[in-house]
């Protein structure tokens, strides 16, 4: 009885995976990636520079913390 329930569980999992593969299509377009790419050109250089400076400051802080 235990083997039958394990077999049924495995078959059910495989059916779910097969259904997910069958419902996927490449004709959906860019999806979320297309929306991100469209808004990336709207970023200002000042914002990018501020983010770069923030990352640089955090990296320097991490290096200072690692010194013995």
Curated annotation (Swiss-Prot):
The modification Pyrrolidone carboxylic acid is found at residue 21. One of its GO terms (cellular component) is extracellular region. PROSITE patterns: AKH (PS00256). Keywords: Amidation, Cleavage on pair of basic residues, Hormone, Neuropeptide, Pyrrolidone carboxylic acid, Secreted, Signal. It is found in: Secreted. GO terms for biological process: neuropeptide signaling pathway. It comes from Agrotis ipsilon. The modification Glycine amide is found at residue 30. Residues 1-20 form the signal peptide. This hormone, released from cells in the corpora cardiaca, causes release of diglycerides from the fat body and stimulation of muscles to use these diglycerides as an energy source during energy-demanding processes. Residues 34-68 form a propeptide. Belongs to the AKH/HRTH/RPCH family. GO terms for molecular function: hormone activity. Expressed in antennal lobe (AL), corpora cardiaca (CC), corpora allata (CA) and gnathal ganglion (GNG) (at protein level). Expression in CC and CA detected in all animals, expression in GNG in some animals and in AL in few animals (at protein level). InterPro entries: Adipokinetic_hormone_CS (IPR002047), AKH/RPCH_hormone (IPR010475). This is Adipokinetic prohormone type 1.
């Amino acid at each position: 009885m235990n083997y039958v329930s394990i077999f049924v569980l495995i078959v059910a999992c495989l059916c779910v995976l097969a259904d997910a593969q069958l419902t996927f299509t490449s004709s959906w377009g860019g999806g979320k990636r297309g929306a991100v790419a469209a808004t990336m050109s709207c970023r200002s250089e000042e914002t990018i520079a501020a983010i770069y400076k923030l990352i640089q400051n955090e990296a320097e802080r991490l290096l200072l913390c690692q010194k013995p």
